[in-house]
């Protein structure tokens, strides 16, 4: 029998690949190789399941990636780079794109996207403050860098996304007047 978390992770993977329209119970049971009985052991209905998939995105996935960046307490730029690297490796950027589309149709997804943005913006703003930027400027730089990531999701080429992010980060971490 699959665990509740197995179902949620499978749903997030399907959401990332197929979008919200492709997230169906029949496809999930086929992917996991189980019957619907396993599903109903963990969730009362599909609506409850969708709420759990949405909640897990910010509560576990995004926070987990942020927590991993702090291992060994690296310098601020390394923390930001780790966040980008880990987000690429575990497909968080792609899932974020799917979550943003879903958020236009479902309040649960909208709430979790907003929560994940707050987590990421707080993380980035702290990194910029640690680089010596005043809080207001650090918050602005954090928002710009997050916007760069959201915009780069439309770039289908992973190398292009990485270059775009690297160039933006170089500009944003440079002291004022040094770009």
Predicted segments with their positions:
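Hydrophobic alpha-helical connector segments
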Residues: 52, 66-93, 97, 142-145
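N-terminal intrinsically disordered/low-complexity leader segments
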Residues: 1-2, 179
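Amphipathic alpha-helical packing segments from all-alpha helical-bundle domains
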Residues: 62, 67, 91-97, 107-132, ...
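Solvent-exposed, amphipathic alpha-helical segments
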Residues: 6, 10-18, 64, 68, ...
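Hydrophobic/aromatic-rich alpha-helical bundle segments in the mid-to-C-terminal region
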Residues: 110, 114, 129-179
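Short, basic, alpha-helical segments at the C-terminal edge of helix-turn-helix-like DNA-binding modules
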Residues: 55-62
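Helix-turn-helix
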Residues: 3-6, 10-48, 52
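Short helix-capping/turn signature of helix-turn-helix
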Residues: 43, 89, 100-105
């Amino acid at each position: 029998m699959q665990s509740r978390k197995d179902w949620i992770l499978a749903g997030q993977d399907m959401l990332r690949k197929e979008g919200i329209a492709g997230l169906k119970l029949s496809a999930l049971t086929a992917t996991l190789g189980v019957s619907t009985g396993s599903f109903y052991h963990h969730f009362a209905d599909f609506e409850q399941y969708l709420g759990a998939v949405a909640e897990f995105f910010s509560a576990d996935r995004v926070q987990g990636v942020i927590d991993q960046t702090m291992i060994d307490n690296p310098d601020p730029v390394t923390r930001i780079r780790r966040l980008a690297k880990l987000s690429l490796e575990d497909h968080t950027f792609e899932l974020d794109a799917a979550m943003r589309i879903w958020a236009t149709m479902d309040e649960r997804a909208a709430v979790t996207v907003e929560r994940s943005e707050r987590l990421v913006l707080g993380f980035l703003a702290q990194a910029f403050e640690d680089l010596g930027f005043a809080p207001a400027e650090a918050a602005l730089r954090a928002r710009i860098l997050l916007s760069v990531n959201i915009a780069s999701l439309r770039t289908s080429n992973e190398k292009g996304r990485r270059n775009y992010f690297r160039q933006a980060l170089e500009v944003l971490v440079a002291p004022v007047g040094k770009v």
